[in-house]
Regions:
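Aromatic-lined substrate-binding rim segments of carbohydrate-active enzymes
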Residues: 68-142, 258-272
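Aromatic- and carboxylate-lined catalytic core of secreted/periplasmic carbohydrate-active enzymes
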Residues: 363-500
């Protein structure tokens, strides 16, 4: 055999081997994160399995390398697995046409080092309804990048959603960012989701009155909007915005205009790198149902609960709308969660206050199937957002959330799967401190608060005597029904009593076994001790330290 023949033979072996190795390398890349829905339940799939975001959002000005050490330290102390971090248009394109993604490089690299996933928040045309994060060359050139006009034709603080060049350049910068994320992260999937703009809408102005906006306002309402957002004028099914929606016309129109603007950006970004995308909402008063017409009392045009359907119609490349919760009242939080948890809208809380009172709502949200929760300002920058959040900027701020996240962290994958399967429920202690009931398959749980761990309230001489440390509401419990008669529950500062319901209604029942423990890295339950006797005779009394129990129940014949 000649040397040429040997060389040709080696080539025939090596070439297929190279293709095989290349295919193996490609197959090793993690699956792209995606949001999935099944039977009205949702899951954020990360690395091919449901993922529970134990998240925190950094302060607005922590998006620079020098601030990151204080961010990672706080997330570690919080037992968090995800960081929400803003990337601003002014930051990446300070000079028109020149892009700088060096901070994004640093952020992604350090996130991997700290084993943290990322949700990128795009501060573009709108941040808290304003133009603060636009590049200077956009902010002040109102001829090229027009602002909204009021009824008198005067400029207002927010830029117009009908400004074609503003949209085109916001979209270009966003696409550049998505291209860069794909370039640096497609083999790792550190970045799992993107928020497009931030708390859009306008305070004090119902809509844009500029020439383009006025012309659009007088046009027929798009059929896709009418199909989802029920007309407010009786007997009308088509027409312009006023004809179809009457007193609601201006708010609905502004919502459609902004949602359409966001859709253009999201669609272009997903064409480059198809990560899940969402919008967040500065909320209106949740107790106003049915919602009243806009009266200057909230940000018109944002994805408030009453216009989610308009956003669904105008922005199909946005996966869901999410509430920013800075209302500590338990009744309002429940209304908000109920409004945003929909079969067509995944529940997530991208921002909420970082004051201690908010920590208990993590149990309620995760029990309701939320894919993630993120207290705002969860870093050690010496900046407090009190009174919306905590007075503290150190570990005292993190601690209430660290305790709750600490019980979910070992079972984060299991919990996300159970929620996707519709097995979970949750409650948070109400401001009225009243007991709450949770109906599950065959069983009912009654959750009460401020109880002593031993005995019943009627045993007390002073019926106004309560367990110390419960002066402020802080209890919560999340349940997962993992079998016909078996539950995993996590909670704190609460008493849980089970009784038969549904098929077990009226049947004598009792606790078969109660184990305290946790899940190991492989998802296997590890028992630490069995509860019985005094620890179960008066219900399951969860202490101030968050605790995980595995409970098995049974019925018997009288």
């Amino acid at each position: 055999m000649t040397l040429n023949q040997i060389a040709r033979g080696v080539k025939h072996i090596v070439a297929p081997l190279c293709l095989l190795l290349a295919a193996g390398g490609a197959a090793a890349a993690p699956e792209l994160p995606r949001l999935v829905e099944r039977d009205g339940k949702h899951a954020l799939m990360v690395d091919g399995a449901p993922f529970l975001m134990l998240a925190g959002q950094a302060h607005n000005s922590s998006n620079y390398p020098a601030a990151l050490p204080k961010v990672w330290a706080a997330l570690k102390d919080a037992n968090a697995n995800t960081l929400e971090m803003p990337i601003a248009w002014e930051q990446v394109e300070p000079k028109e046409g020149t892009f700088d993604f060096s901070f994004l490089d640093t952020l992604v690299r350090q996130a991997r080092q700290n084993k943290i996933r990322l949700v990128i928040i795009w501060f573009g045309t709108w941040k808290n309804t304003g133009p603060g994060y636009l590049p200077e060359w956009v902010k002040f050139d109102n001829a090229r990048f027009p602002r909204m006009k009021d009824k008198d034709g005067k400029n207002v603080y927010s830029h117009s959603p009908f400004a074609e060049e503003t949209l085109a350049l916001d979209r270009r910068a966003f696409v550049k960012m998505m291209e860069h994320i794909k370039k640096i992260d497609s083999d790792h999937r550190t970045v799992i989701m993107v928020q497009v703009e931030n708390e859009v809408g306008t305070y004090g102005f119902a809509r844009d009155h500029g020439p383009r906006a006025q012309a659009a306002f007088e046009q027929p309402v798009p059929a896709a909007v009418v199909a989802r957002q029920k007309p407010k004028v009786a007997g009308v099914t088509s027409g312009n915005w006023t004809q179809v929606y009457g007193d609601y016309a201006e708010q609905y129109f502004h919502s459609w205009a902004i949602a359409s603007y966001i859709e253009s950006i999201a669609k272009a970004g997903r064409a480059v790198y198809d990560l899940p995308m969402f919008v967040n909402a500065a909320l209106r008063e949740p107790s106003a149902k049915p919602a009243l017409p806009w009266q200057g009392n909230f940000a018109s045009g944002g994805p408030t609960y009453d216009v989610i359907d308009i956003y669904k119609a105008a922005a199909p490349h946005i996966d869901f709308a999410a509430p920013d919760i800075y209302m500590p009242e338990s009744s309002k939080v429940s209304l908000i969660l109920d409004s945003y948890k929909r079969p067509d809208n995944a529940l997530m809380i991208p921002e909420m206050g970082n004051a201690p009172a908010y920590a208990r709502y993590v149990y309620q949200a995760f029990g309701m199937g939320a894919i993630g929760v993120a207290p705002f300002g969860l870093d050690y920058a010496e900046y407090s957002n009190y009174p919306l959040g905590s007075k503290f900027t150190d570990r005292r701020m993190v601690e209430p959330f660290a305790k709750v996240y600490g019980v979910f962290a070992p079972m984060q994958r299991q919990w996300a799967r159970w929620a996707f399967e519709g097995r979970t429920h949750g409650v948070a202690e109400g401001d009225d401190r009243a007991a709450q009931t949770v109906e599950m398959n065959g069983w009912k749980a009654t959750v009460s608060f401020r109880e002593f761990q031993f005995g019943e309230r009627q045993y007390l001489k002073d019926k106004n005597e309560f367990q110390s440390g419960t002066e402020q509401p802080g209890g919560g419990v999340a349940f997962a029904q993992i079998g016909e008669n078996e539950f995993v529950l996590a909670g704190q500062q609460a008493r849980v009593k089970f009784s038969g319901s549904g098929a077990n209604d009226g049947k004598p029942s009792m606790l078969a076994r109660v184990e305290e423990g946790s899940f190991d890295a492989n998802g296997k339950w590890v028992m630490e001790r069995n509860w019985n006797g005094d620890q179960t005779d008066y219900g399951l009394n969860l202490p101030a330290t968050p605790t995980v129990l595995k409970v098995r129940l049974g019925t018997y014949q009288e």
